[in-house]
C-alpha cells in the first residue's frame, strides 16, 4: 500500500480549539515538559486512524523492553521504529473507518478475559447522541470555548489510539470512580494488571503490545480526557522508502486524537461495558473494589452504606495515588526509549515539539486547578526531584518527559470539574443564536460565528533562553543547520456550534476535512519554565525531537552517535512562510505565535524566487527556500532563525505607531461580541458578520491609514501571474506582504546592516492581517469573486496652488520607477522613504512614452498643505525624517511626485473661481434667453394690432375716358406693430356728379348749356340767367355710378411704428374699366346712383327733348351715355368703401373704411 492510498482528502466543518491556557505555554515554574515519546491510550479510534495488526516479531521485543524497563540506545530505537514504520503488513485494509468504535479485537487479551469480560462492538446511542458527545460542541470542553466556521480542503490523516495511556490513567485510583468516566476505569485496570503480572507475564505483554506497535510505526500522540481543551492535530503518514525521490508534501504536526467525535463514541462503549464487567475483576474489601495491586477504588454504588468511611478512604487514597503516581515516573521513563518518534512530517515542525507544547499546556491547567490540594502538589514536586536523581544514568530528556507525563493525570479531576460548571448567560445566548442560524439550511445569508484564537495574543508569548539558543547555533555545522526547515501552522480551526441540531449534525457527518494546525512546539520555553531541569536535559530533548525534514536524513541519524545528534538541533521556533528571518546571534529573539494560516499544499507551491536567500559580507538575511523537490535548501553561510510576528502584535504596534491618525479601534466588533467582554472565564471575543465564509471582511476593510495600496487586487495578481511570478523594477508593490518581509530582528542599534545584492524589492511589515497576503492560504481571499476591486476610500480636496504637477516634465511613476533603481536598506530599523503610490502604478508604466500622458489611472492632486502633511507622515513612518540639532525637519529621499492614490471616490471638494463664473454665465444666459424669448413673444402679441387712423389723403392724376377711368389714391395710416402691413384687397365704389346734365322722368338727359344760349339770343338775357340759377339751386344735379373697384393695382404697405411711432403713407392706383356700363356695375351688386355727368339741368327744355323711350329701362342700367355727356364738363369724383388686410402671426383679417371726393376738370390741367 503506497502513501497515496493512505491519504484521504476530507472536507469538514473545521473546529477552533478551545482558547484556554493550554494553547500556548506560559511561564509557570510548575509546568513540566511532557514526554512526547510516550504514546497515550485512547478509548476509541480516530476518524482517519490506522490500526496496526499484532505482529509477534515486531512487537514482542518492544513489549518486553517496555515492561522490563530496558534502556536501548537511540540508534536501536530509531532503527526499530523505521523498520516497523515502512512495513506495509502492519496496516489494516480498512484504515479509514470513520465513526467505528473499538471492538474486542482492539483490546488486549488479558484485559478482555480477566477484567472486562466482553466489549460490545457497536453503540446503539452513538448516532443519536453524537452531538452530546461531540468534542466540537461547547458543553464538552470549556463552556467559553470558541468555534469558528470556515470551509477548506486539506490533506489530513490521524494516528490510532495509543495504549500507553494506561500508565497515565492509573495515577488517581481514589478519585477515578467518582469523577472520571467508566472508560478511564477500564484503562486504569488494564494498567494495574500489566504491573502486577510483572515483566515476564504474558498478559502484560499483551496489554502493552499495541502501544509498542503504535509507537514504532507512527509519531507520538498525546491523549487527554473528555474535558481536555487541546485542539486536534492530525498526523500524516510517512512515505515508503521507494518514494523518497518524489516531491515531498509538507504536512501538519501531531493531532490529539481525543478531540474527535469517534473517540467519544468508543468511550461510550467502554462506559457501558465496564459498568457490567468491572465488579467481576476486583475483590471487595470494606465496601469498595480493590485493584490487583492493592490500591482501593471506592465503589460509588456502595456509597450509601457507609458514607463517612468512603470520604475518609477517598482522601487517603488521593494522597496515596499522588505518591504512587510520582513514584511510577521511573517506570514510564523506560517506555520512552522504545516509543520515541521515528519520523516527523516533512517540512513541518517536530511532532514531539507539538506534543510538548500541548501536554505542557494541559499541565498548566493542572497546576492552576491543583492549587487547592497542597499535599498533592508537595508530593508531586518531591517526586519530580527524586525521579531526576534516580534516573541520572538515563537520558535527561526521558526523565523530563516522564515527569511531565505523570502530572498530566490530574487533568481527569480538573476537567470533570470544569465540565460540571454551568454555562453563563452569554454562552447560552450564543448557542441559541448559532442554533437559529444553523437551522435554516437553505439560508441565503450563510451567517457564521467567527472566533479569534488566543494563540495570536501577546499575553501568551513564550520567552526562550536566548543564551542557550545561541550556544546551539554556534555548535551546529552550517550544512546541518541549513537542512532544518520548520513550517509552523497556527492552531486556528473552526466549525459551526452544534447544540442538538440534527441538520448541522448531518452536515458534520459528510465528507469534509478538518483543518488543524500545530501548537507552538518550543521546547526551550518549556524547559525554561521548569527550574528542576538542568541544561543537559534540553540538549537531550533536542536529540529526540529534532525535525527530520527528509527521508534520507534517517540513515545519517541512525549512524551518528548521540553527541553528534546534539549538534543538529535548530533554533526552536515556529516558522511561517512569509515571516522574516535573520541570523544575528546577538539579537534577542522572542518566540511569537505564528501569523500565517497556510494550508499544507501551499507550502510546497510557494514561488522559489520569493523565497530566495541573499548573502553579503558574511551576514545573511534569508528566507526559507522551498524548492519543488524539497530535497535541500540553497546553501548559506549561516543558519537562519525565523521570527514570526503575530496578528495582534502587528496590530498593537501599528496602533501605537498610527495613534495620531485617529481612532484605531477595530470597527467590526458588534453587539454580540460585547456580551463576551465580561465573561470571567476568559473566553475570546466573538465577531459576528453576515458575509460568506470565503470573504475575510475584516482584512479587506481594515487598511492602513498611510498606505493607500489595496492588497490582493485582481489586476495585480493577474499582472504578477502573467509574468512568471516576477515583478519588474518599475512596479510599486511597496507594503505588500505577498513576498518575504525582511527586517533585522528589530535591532535598531545594529548599524552595520547587510546590503541586498539580488533582491528586486524591499518590503516592510505592515499592520494588516497576514491572512489576506498568503495567496496559497485557505483563508486567502483575492477579491476576484467581487464585482469590482475597490481600493482604499479616501477623500482629498483639489489642489488650488498647483506647483510641481504642472511642470511639463513631471512624471507620475513610483519610487521604483526611477532611473537609478537604487535599493536602500533600512537604517535604524526603518525603511527609506517611498512614493506613496497605489497598485495602479503599473498601468502607468515606466517608459518615457507614458511619463507625460494622463490617463484614467492618473490620480487627483492634493492641496499644498495636504501634500506636505502626507509627505511628513510617510517620511516619519519610513524613517526618512531626521531631527538635527536645531530641531529642523529635513526631508530626505522624498519624491516630489508624491501623489494621492487613485480612487473613484476622489473628487474636488471646492470649485475654482473660473468654474464659478462660468457656471454663473451659463445660468445667466439661460435665464436671459428665457426672458428675452418671453419678452419678444409678449411684445409681438402686444404690438400686432390693426391699422390706426387710416385716411385717403388725396386722389389725383385722374384720367377720364369713355372706356376707362384711372386715378391715384394716397392713403396714410399708423401701424402700432413691429412688422409691416400690406393692403391689396379693397371694396371701393366710384361715383361721378355733375350739374350740367338734365334728365327727365323717362331718363332722357340733355345738356342745359345749349338751351340757355338759345334763349339768351332770342329773349332778354336777365331773365335767362335768373331761370338758370333757379335750376341749379333747385337741385338739378345728376349723380352717376361708374362702377366698383375690388383690387388695387399696387398694394398699400404700412411700416411698423412700434419704436418710432410715426404715421406711414402709401400710394396706389385704382383702375375701372367701362365706367357706367352694366359689367362695371355688376362686379358689385350695389345699385348706387352715381353722378357722373357734369351738366346743367334746365327747366322744361331738356325734359321735353329727352322723353323717355320704349327702351328707357335698359338705358337706366346702362349709363354709358351719361358718362359720355359728363366727361365734357367738370364733375366731381367720389370714392367710398373699405380696405382689407391681415395682421402678422395672427392670420386674422381686418378692414377699415375710407371715403374721399375730388373735383375733376377735364379741359384743365
Curated annotation (Swiss-Prot):
Molecular function GO terms recorded: enzyme activator activity
Annotated membrane topology: Single-pass type II membrane protein
Manganese as UniProt keyword: no
Compositionally skewed regions (Polar residues) per UniProt: 216-230, 346-367, 393-412, 576-587, 614-662
Compositional bias of kind Low complexity: 334-345, 375-391, 469-485, 562-571, 599-613
Sequence ranges on the Vacuolar membrane side: 941-1165
InterPro entries: Vac7
Region annotation Disordered: where it falls in the sequence: 118-147, 215-241, 274-423, 461-497, 560-668, 1074-1121
Protein localization: Vacuole membrane
Record flagged with keyword Membrane: yes
Chain ranges passing through the membrane: 920-940
Residues with PTM Phosphoserine: 164
Biological process, per Gene Ontology: 1-phosphatidyl-1D-myo-inositol 3,5-bisphosphate metabolic process; positive regulation of phosphatidylinositol biosynthetic process; protein localization to vacuolar membrane; regulation of phosphatidylinositol biosynthetic process; vacuole inheritance
Cytoplasmic compartment segments: 1-919
GO cellular component, one term: membrane
Predominant location: membrane
Basic and acidic residues: bias regions: 413-423, 1111-1121
UniProt keyword annotations, A-Z: Glycoprotein, Membrane, Phosphoprotein, Signal-anchor, Transmembrane, Transmembrane helix, Vacuole
Residue ranges that the Swiss-Prot or TrEMBL entry lists as coiled coil: none
Posttranslational mods: N-glycosylated.
Composition bias type Acidic residues, residue spans: 1085-1100
PANTHER family hit by this protein: VACUOLAR SEGREGATION PROTEIN 7
Subunit structure: Component of the PI(3,5)P2 regulatory complex, composed of ATG18, FIG4, FAB1, VAC14 and VAC7. VAC14 nucleates the assembly of the complex and serves as a scaffold.
Primary role: The PI(3,5)P2 regulatory complex regulates both the synthesis and turnover of phosphatidylinositol 3,5-bisphosphate (PtdIns(3,5)P2). Positively regulates FAB1 kinase activity. Major activator of FAB1 during hyperosmotic shock and can elevate levels of PtdIns(3,5)P2 in the absence of VAC14 and FIG4. Directly involved in vacuolar membrane scission. Required for normal vacuole acidification, inheritance and morphology.
Name of the featured protein: Vacuolar segregation protein 7
Species classification: Eukaryota, Fungi, Dikarya, Ascomycota, Saccharomycotina
Amino acid at each position: 500500500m503506497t502513501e497515496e492510498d493512505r491519504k484521504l482528502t476530507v472536507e469538514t466543518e473545521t473546529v477552533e480549539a478551545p482558547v484556554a491556557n493550554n494553547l500556548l505555554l506560559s511561564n509557570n515554574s510548575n509546568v513540566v515538559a511532557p514526554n512526547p515519546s510516550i504514546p497515550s491510550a485512547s478509548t476509541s479510534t480516530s476518524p482517519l486512524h490506522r490500526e496496526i495488526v499484532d505482529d509477534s516479531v515486531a512487537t514482542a521485543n518492544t513489549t518486553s523492553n517496555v515492561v522490563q524497563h530496558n534502556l536501548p540506545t537511540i540508534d536501536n530505537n530509531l532503527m526499530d521504529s523505521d523498520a516497523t514504520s515502512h512495513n506495509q503488513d502492519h496496516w489494516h485494509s480498512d484504515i479509514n473507518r470513520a465513526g467505528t468504535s473499538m471492538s474486542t479485537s482492539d483490546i488486549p487479551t488479558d484485559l478482555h478475559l480477566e477484567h472486562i469480560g466482553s466489549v460490545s462492538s457497536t453503540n446503539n446511542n452513538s448516532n443519536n447522541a453524537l452531538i452530546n458527545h461531540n468534542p466540537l460542541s461547547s458543553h464538552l470542553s470549556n463552556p467559553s470555548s470558541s468555534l469558528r466556521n470556515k470551509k477548506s480542503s486539506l490533506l489530513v490523516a490521524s494516528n490510532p489510539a495509543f495504549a500507553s495511556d494506561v500508565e497515565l490513567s492509573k495515577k488517581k485510583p481514589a478519585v477515578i470512580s467518582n469523577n472520571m468516566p467508566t472508560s478511564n476505569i477500564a484503562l486504569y485496570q488494564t494498567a494495574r494488571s500489566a504491573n502486577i503480572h510483572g515483566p515476564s507475564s504474558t498478559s502484560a505483554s499483551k496489554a502493552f503490545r499495541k502501544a509498542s506497535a503504535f509507537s514504532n510505526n507512527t509519531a507520538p500522540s498525546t491523549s487527554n480526557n473528555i474535558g481536555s481543551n487541546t485542539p486536534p492535530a492530525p498526523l500524516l503518514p510517512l512515505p515508503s522508502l521507494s518514494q523518497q525521490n518524489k516531491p515531498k508534501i509538507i504536512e501538519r504536526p501531531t493531532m490529539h486524537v481525543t478531540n474527535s467525535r469517534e473517540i467519544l463514541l468508543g468511550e461510550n462503549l467502554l462506559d457501558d461495558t465496564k459498568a457490567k464487567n468491572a465488579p467481576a475483576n476486583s475483590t471487595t474489601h470494606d465496601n469498595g473494589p480493590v485493584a490487583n495491586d492493592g490500591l482501593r477504588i471506592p465503589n460509588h454504588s456502595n456509597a450509601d452504606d457507609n458514607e463517612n468511611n468512603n470520604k475518609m478512604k477517598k482522601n487517603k487514597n488521593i494522597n496515596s495515588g499522588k505518591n504512587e503516581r510520582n513514584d511510577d515516573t521511573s517506570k514510564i521513563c523506560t517506555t520512552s526509549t522504545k516509543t520515541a518518534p521515528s519520523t516527523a512530517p516533512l517540512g513541518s515542525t517536530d511532532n514531539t515539539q507539538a506534543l510538548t507544547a500541548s501536554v505542557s499546556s494541559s499541565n498548566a491547567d493542572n497546576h492552576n486547578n491543583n492549587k487547592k490540594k497542597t499535599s498533592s502538589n508537595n508530593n508531586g514536586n518531591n517526586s519530580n526531584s527524586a525521579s531526576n536523581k534516580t534516573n541520572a544514568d538515563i537520558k535527561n530528556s526521558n526523565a523530563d518527559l516522564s515527569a511531565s507525563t505523570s502530572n498530566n493525570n490530574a487533568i481527569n479531576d480538573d476537567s470533570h470539574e470544569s465540565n460540571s460548571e454551568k454555562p453563563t448567560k452569554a454562552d447560552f445566548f450564543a448557542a441559541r443564536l448559532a442554533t437559529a442560524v444553523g437551522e435554516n439550511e437553505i439560508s441565503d445569508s450563510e451567517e457564521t460565528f467567527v472566533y479569534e484564537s488566543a494563540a495570536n495574543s501577546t499575553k501568551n508569548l513564550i520567552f526562550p533562553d536566548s543564551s542557550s539558543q545561541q550556544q546551539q547555533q554556534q555548535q551546529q555545522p552550517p550544512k546541518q543547520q541549513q537542512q532544518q526547515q520548520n513550517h509552523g501552522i497556527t492552531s486556528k480551526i473552526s466549525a459551526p456550534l452544534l447544540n442538538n441540531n440534527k441538520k448541522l449534525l448531518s452536515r458534520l457527518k459528510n465528507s469534509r476535512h478538518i483543518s488543524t494546525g500545530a501548537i507552538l512546539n518550543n521546547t526551550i520555553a518549556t524547559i525554561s519554565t521548569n527550574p528542576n531541569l538542568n541544561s543537559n536535559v534540553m540538549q537531550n530533548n533536542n536529540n529526540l525531537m529534532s525535525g527530520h525534514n527528509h527521508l534520507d536524513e534517517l540513515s545519517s541519524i541512525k549512524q551518528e552517535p548521540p553527541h553528534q545528534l546534539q549538534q543538529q538541533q535548530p533554533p526552536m521556533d515556529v516558522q511561517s512562510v512569509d515571516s522574516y528571518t535573520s541570523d544575528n546571534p546577538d539579537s534577542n529573539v522572542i518566540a511569537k505565535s505564528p501569523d500565517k494560516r497556510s494550508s499544507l499544499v501551499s507550502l510546497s507551491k510557494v514561488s522559489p524566487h520569493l523565497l530566495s536567500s541573499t548573502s553579503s559580507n558574511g551576514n545573511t538575511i534569508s528566507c526559507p527556500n522551498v524548492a519543488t523537490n524539497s530535497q535541500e535548501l540553497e546553501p548559506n553561510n549561516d543558519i537562519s532563525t525565523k521570527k514570526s510576528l503575530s496578528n495582534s502584535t502587528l496590530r498593537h504596534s501599528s496602533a501605537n505607531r498610527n495613534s495620531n491618525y485617529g481612532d484605531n479601534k477595530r470597527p467590526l466588533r458588534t453587539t454580540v461580541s460585547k456580551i463576551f467582554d465580561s465573561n470571567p472565564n476568559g473566553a475570546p471575543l466573538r465577531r459576528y458578520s453576515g458575509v460568506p465564509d470565503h470573504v475575510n471582511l475584516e482584512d479587506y476593510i481594515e487598511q492602513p491609514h498611510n498606505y493607500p495600496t489595496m492588497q490582493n487586487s485582481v489586476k495585480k495578481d493577474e499582472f504578477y501571474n502573467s509574468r512568471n511570478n516576477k515583478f519588474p523594477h518599475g512596479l510599486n508593490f511597496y507594503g505588500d506582504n505577498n513576498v518575504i518581509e525582511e527586517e533585522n530582528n528589530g535591532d535598531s542599534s545594529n548599524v552595520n546592516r547587510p546590503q541586498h545584492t539580488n533582491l528586486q524589492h524591499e518590503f516592510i511589515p505592515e499592520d494588516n492581517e497576514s491572512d489576506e497576503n498568503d495567496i496559497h492560504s485557505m483563508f486567502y481571499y483575492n477579491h476576484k469573486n467581487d464585482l469590482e476591486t475597490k481600493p482604499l476610500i479616501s477623500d482629498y480636496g483639489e489642489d488650488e496652488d498647483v506647483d510641481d504637477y504642472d511642470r511639463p516634465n513631471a512624471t507620475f511613476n513610483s519610487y521604483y520607477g526611477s532611473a537609478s533603481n537604487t535599493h536602500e536598506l533600512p537604517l535604524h530599523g526603518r525603511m527609506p522613504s517611498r512614493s506613496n503610490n497605489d497598485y495602479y502604478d503599473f498601468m502607468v508604466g515606466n517608459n518615457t512614452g507614458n511619463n507625460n500622458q494622463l490617463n484614467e489611472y492618473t490620480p487627483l492632486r492634493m492641496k499644498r498643505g495636504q501634500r506636505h502633511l502626507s509627505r511628513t507622515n510617510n517620511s516619519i513612518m519610513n524613517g526618512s525624517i531626521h531631527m538635527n540639532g536645531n530641531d529642523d525637519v529635513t526631508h530626505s529621499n522624498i519624491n516630489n511626485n508624491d501623489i494621492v492614490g487613485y480612487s473613484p471616490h476622489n473628487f474636488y471638494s471646492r470649485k475654482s473661481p473660473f468654474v464659478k463664473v462660468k457656471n454663473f454665465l451659463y445660468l445667466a444666459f439661460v435665464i436671459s434667453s428665457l426672458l428675452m424669448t418671453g419678452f419678444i413673444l409678449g411684445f409681438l402679441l402686444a404690438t400686432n394690432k390693426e391699422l390706426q387712423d387710416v385716411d385717403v389723403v388725396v386722389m389725383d392724376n385722374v384720367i377720364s375716358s369713355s372706356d376707362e377711368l384711372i386715378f391715384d389714391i394716397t392713403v396714410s395710416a399708423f401701424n402700432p406693430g413691429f412688422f409691416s402691413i400690406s393692403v391689396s384687397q379693397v371694396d371701393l365704389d366710384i361715383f361721378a356728379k355733375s350739374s350740367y346734365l338734365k334728365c327727365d322722368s323717362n331718363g332722357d338727359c340733355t345738356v342745359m348749356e345749349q338751351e340757355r344760349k338759345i334763349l339768351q339770343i332770342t329773349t332778354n338775357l336777365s331773365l335767362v340767367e335768373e331761370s338758370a340759377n333757379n335750376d341749379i339751386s333747385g337741385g338739378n344735379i345728376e349723380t352717376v355710378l361708374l362702377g366698383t373697384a375690388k383690387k388695387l393695382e399696387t398694394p398699400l404697405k404700412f411700416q411698423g411704428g412700434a419704436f418710432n411711432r410715426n404715421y406711414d403713407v402709401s400710394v396706389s392706383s385704382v383702375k375701372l374699366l367701362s365706367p357706367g356700363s352694366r359689367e362695371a356695375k355688376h362686379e358689385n351688386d350695389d345699385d348706387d346712383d352715381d353722378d357722373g355727368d357734369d351738366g346743367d339741368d334746365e327747366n322744361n327744355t331738356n325734359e321735353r327733348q329727352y322723353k323717355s323711350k320704349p327702351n328707357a329701362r335698359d338705358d337706366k342700367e346702362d349709363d354709358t351715355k351719361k358718362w359720355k355727356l359728363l366727361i365734357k364738363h367738370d364733375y366731381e369724383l367720389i370714392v367710398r368703401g373699405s380696405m382689407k388686410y391681415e395682421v402678422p402671426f395672427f392670420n386674422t383679417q381686418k378692414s377699415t373704411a375710407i371715403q374721399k371726393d375730388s373735383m375733376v376738370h377735364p379741359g384743365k390741367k
